[in-house]
Amino acid sequence: MRKIYKLFIGIMLSAIAVACSDKLDSDKYFKDRRSLEDVFTDKESTEEWLANAYSYLGGYNLEVSNMLNTITNFADDIYFGGNSLDAYKTFKTGTYDESYRHSWGDSYKGIRQASIFIQNIDMNTKYTEEERADLKAQARFVRAYYYWLLLRKYGPIPLLPDEGLDYTSDYDDLAIQRSSYDECVEYIESEMRLAAKDLPLTRAINQVARPTRGAALAARARALVYSASPINNPRPGDPDKFSDLVDYEGNCLMSQEYNEYKWARAAAAARDVMELPGENNGHRYELYHKKATNIAEPGYPATIPPYQDGDFSTKTWNEGGYSDIDPYESYRAVFNGSLAMYQNPELIFSRGRNQGAN
């Protein structure tokens, strides 16, 4: 009996030893680790990497309300509610802090992903040259857009090297200080302009949330408008010029002198967007309008004759008037979801959903 017991104990100890040996054999856990070359020579993995760069536009970088189920319609600043009511009020009044939105970290994660993509996409030969150019332009747009989101919230921010940072470097080498507001805007402007060269004017329905040429040029114009505004382009009599916002060397990060050229440049950039060619009276974008009708249907009343002002009321839409449109339905359709995203001539860039918190 004792021999049987010893034999049983021996077998159990051997089994445990084998199991422990398997546990300690860590080689199998490294089989799933892939090099950048492995990722960017595989088409599916390449697209997954770009999708991950996009992903940080959600979460903490979604800034308004929580209308999660209305992805095809807009909502104006009048509407907010649900379980994010207090958070949205905080955003509206500018009283939020980093405990409310951790977009700093998420944005720089997206910037890193996009930069790596830009540096490595050219090694993938499974795409045509045109496809690679589009994908690289998307990543360039996304990276510049993260910087734009950061600039709006934090003011002057650190601009990282395009090739990234070596995390094994000393802290002093990794601690990139803020660039000036003008430097940030110039970077965003140049990157958006470069991205616009290879982005298409339109996207297919299944790619409606990807940036177009108009999206890049519009973000560029917005950044230039912010740079031209009093916050960074003060007139002599402006009381607060943010002169105490300086870098480690004491250089002021905000412009201290008014420059009229900034407004001219912003206006020209906005015009670049407005004059993009398209199928809306020769333009890519225009205000959505619904034709007037005298037929009433459930939920859709007949057109109420608009105010007769003797000018616009006598002209058609193409002539700059409103005699042949339904003003009420033209406005309502944009907000109630009856107008799909891809059909909306006003839509320049969307993240694929209307509003939404996490």
Residue ranges and their predicted role:
Residues 21-84, 157, 214, 225-358:
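An aromatic- and glycine-enriched ligand-binding surface/loop that stacks and positions planar moieties
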Residues 162-168, 240-243:
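Short, conserved phosphate-binding/catalytic loop or strand-edge motifs used
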Residues 38-61, 65, 80-154, 171-208:
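Conserved, well-structured interaction surfaces
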Residues 1-31:
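Bacterial Sec-dependent N-terminal signal peptides
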Residues 161-166, 192, 227-229:
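Short, small-residue-rich loop/turn micro-motifs
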Residues 156-163, 196-206, 281-288:
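Glycine- and aromatic-rich loop/turn segments at beta-sheet edges
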Residues 209-219, 223:
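Amphipathic alpha-helical protein-interaction segments enriched in hydrophobic
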